[in-house]
């Protein structure tokens, strides 16, 4: 099941900007989709911003997530504070306002300040929370400003039931099938 993120650039799903609860509004959408499909428990895989979404799912509905794969997870580093807010204000927000005339840049600014105001770690949960997560996790690190290797590896070190793929896993391209095989094995082992 692929999820079409509400208000994402290049996607079709639209909806209100829930300024006071940006992460939870997306989690509501994710859980609502699973409820609509009659799926109580599920495996989940997310790339990039999917990492913080998965952490929020684990906070809100840990009993429903059987196992999770966090690929190239987003995270915040001290030397790149403001990266997500600034990138989204410069790219996502103007695009959204152009597509949805009822949405203003002021609303986007408030939404993004609430979304990325906790510009630390993985945005949606604390390090103390990660230490308590018993759900099996597979982390596929990256190392670009939006997907910092250090943050991905910190989650692996903190989460008691976590595993990590080789790194780098995308280059050379011959490594990709090995990473895919590891993901498949991980998901099969926890279904």
Pin down the residues of each PLM region.
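The alpha/beta-hydrolase serine catalytic core
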Residues: 73, 78-133
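Conserved hydrolase catalytic core segment
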Residues: 40-76
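Conserved alpha/beta-hydrolase
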Residues: 1-12
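Short beta-strand/loop motif that positions the catalytic acidic residue
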Residues: 133, 139-141
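Conserved acidic catalytic loop of the alpha/beta-hydrolase fold
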Residues: 24-42
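Catalytic active-site module of serine/aspartate enzymes centered on a nucleophile-bearing elbow/loop
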Residues: 162-191
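Catalytic nucleophile-loop/oxyanion-hole region of alpha/beta-hydrolase
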Residues: 12-27
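Conserved alpha/beta-hydrolase "acid-adjacent" motif
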Residues: 145-151
């Amino acid at each position: 099941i692929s999820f079409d993120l509400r208000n994402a650039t290049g996607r079709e799903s639209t909806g209100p900007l829930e300024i006071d609860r940006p992460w939870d509004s997306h989690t509501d959408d994710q859980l609502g989709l699973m409820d609509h499909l009659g799926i109580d428990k599920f495996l989940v895989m997310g790339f990039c911003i999917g990492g913080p979404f998965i952490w929020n799912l684990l906070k809100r509905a840990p009993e429903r997530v059987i196992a999770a794969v966090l690929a190239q997870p987003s995270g915040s580093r001290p030397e790149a504070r403001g990266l997500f807010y600034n990138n989204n204000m410069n790219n996502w927000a103007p695009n959204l306002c152009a597509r949805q005339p009822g949405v203003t840049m002021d609303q986007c600014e408030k939404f993004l300040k609430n979304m990325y105001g906790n510009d630390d770690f993985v945005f949606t949960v604390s390090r103390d929370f990660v230490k308590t997560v018993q759900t099996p996790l597979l982390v596929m690190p990256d190392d670009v400003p939006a997907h910092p290797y250090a943050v991905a590896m910190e989650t692996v070190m903190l989460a008691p039931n976590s595993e990590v793929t080789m790194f780098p896993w995308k280059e050379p391209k011959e490594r990709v099938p090995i990473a895919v095989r590891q993901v498949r094995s991980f998901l099969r082992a926890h279904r």
